[in-house]
């Protein structure tokens, strides 16, 4: 019976992602958010880090495409959500999460570098407000993240995805 659980679980995820894909094709981006949040919930329950990260990326993409960020803090709220997920993970999942967290920050920097590179560096930067980070803040965060991962490189090599 345990052998079928992963197959059943994967079918659930495949079916949900197919719904998401179909909605994208028909322009129903916002309709995907409840599906994606349900995938996140199930992934947390199943401890399926790959599906969790995929759903988080999709949520971030939908939020950026469909919501007006009048307070200019949507990204900060999303990264706060990411950090709360990180607190619940352990072992290999935590390391994979750490890799993907760095990737999120790098992608955000790459997509917004034209604006970020114009900001002045401050000593008292509010690190909870990613929208105000300077190039130096991103550099410092990514160096710290890379150092954490570099210390675990032997362990990372053994992780099977």
Indicate residue ranges for each PLM-predicted region:
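Bacterial Sec-dependent N-terminal signal peptides
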Residues: 1-16
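Extracytoplasmic/secretory-pathway proteins
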Residues: 13-161
